[in-house]
Amino acid sequence: MLKKTLILLLVIAVCIPSLSQMMISHPWQGRRVAYFGDSITDPRNSGSKKKYWNFLQEWLGITPYVYGVSGRQWNDIPHQADKLQKEHGDDFDAIMIFIGTNDFNAAVPVGEWYTESDERVLAAVHEPKAIVTRKKRTFIYTDSTFCGRINKAMALLKKRWPKKQIVLLTPIHRAYFYGGEKNIQPTEEYQNKAGEYFDKYVEKVKEAGNIWAVPVIDVNATSGLFPLFDESAVNYHDPDTDRLHPNDLGHQRLARTLEYQLLSLPCVF
């Protein structure tokens, strides 16, 4: 009897991992994903041979539609969306947006999400209906501020593809970058020309999730990429001149983080 029990337990131990793999299917497996962004997404950027979306393509079979362009800021998202629509229409599953670090570097003012005004509106709360005066928030759509740019982009995407999943990624930590005598970017320890620290822009992307009802993956926190220390610069293109762009190792780490974070999000509805 003991021998049979041991054999049964051994069979169960061998089969459980296989059964769990069969039962758990990644929701982004085999999907078609459009990637909007900047140089970290741009396949032409020389900081790495493989980007995070290349790894996701290998691991999950995702078909990537890549529109990220080096140097771009949030005000370029509508242009990238237009290219996606022209090339694929509605024939894709989700959009991932990974942008914002260049807005910080360009010292784009952070701005506000809304204006407020006193407006007259019909209301009834356990009493007869009446026209009352209340504060009203109105979205600010402008290219002159970071929040206004996000509002413009998200309004366009929400109206154009209301059924699609849209995922925002926060910008990741950044350190020294030398791209020539007219392109020297200090570490995030310094404010930009607008007097703002980098994390203010990260926080605004996180706020956008609640404002626009889209999931945000905080890769600034979860990826572990931290180029400010020499010991961590192993994940970046060049420890001496480029701690802005992850290298292959950094992109792999970023992609692995996304692989697991995306397990909790539907790709299609």
Regions found by a protein language model. Give the residues of each.
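A generic structural signal for short, solvent-exposed coil/turn residues
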Residues: 6, 25-27, 56-58, 158, ...
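A periodicity- and composition-biased signal for non-globular, repetitive helical segments
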Residues: 9-10, 78, 155
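Hydrophobic alpha-helical membrane context
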Residues: 15-16, 50, 115
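Hydrophobic core
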Residues: 10, 14-18
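Serine-esterase "nucleophile elbow" of acetyl-processing enzymes
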Residues: 20-70, 75-90, 95, 230-232
